[in-house]
């Protein structure tokens, strides 16, 4: 972990946005299983109920990102848990993930709009963007997880 990352994590802890937490392999595998189920369900409804597919892909991304944090002894602890989770996951994963994390953060904002503003519906283009982002993110993070903890049960690539 580089010094900038450590400084960010220290700052987030002081602000009450990040806490230390250990998680065992069973818990991490349960999160990964849930992410896999969300992705499977999203693929089933994709093209039929775009908003539902979008949210399922999003939930899977969030669960995978939480695994990354927990593997590093961290968890979000604030009113912006999703934002914090993606921010910290991107920092842990490194600079080659930053473009994907920026895309996920934009999609997170769309998801919030959709959730809190019924006029902000999610359409086919947003769902496809979420699918391709989820696919790319999982395929990259899967490799990271394989190297980091061989006890994890990793589902197939999207």
Question: Each PLM stretch: what is its role?
Answer:
Residues 1-158:
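Terminal alpha-helical segments
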């Amino acid at each position: 972990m580089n010094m900038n990352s450590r400084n960010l994590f220290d700052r987030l802890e002081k602000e009450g946005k990040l806490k230390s937490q250990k998680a065992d392999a069973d818990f991490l595998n349960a999160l990964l299983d849930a992410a896999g189920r969300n992705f499977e369900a999203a693929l089933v409804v994709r093209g039929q109920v775009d908003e539902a597919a979008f949210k399922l892909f999003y939930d899977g991304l969030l669960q995978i990102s939480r695994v990354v944090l927990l593997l590093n002894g961290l968890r979000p602890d604030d009113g912006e848990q999703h934002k914090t989770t993606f921010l910290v996951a991107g920092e842990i994963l490194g600079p080659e993930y930053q473009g994907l994390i920026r895309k996920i953060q934009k999609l997170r904002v769309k998801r919030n709009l959709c959730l809190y503003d019924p006029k902000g519906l999610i359409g086919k283009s947003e769902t496809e963007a979420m699918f391709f982002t989820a696919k790319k993110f999982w395929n990259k993070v899967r490799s990271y997880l394989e190297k980091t903890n061989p006890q994890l049960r990793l589902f197939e690539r999207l």
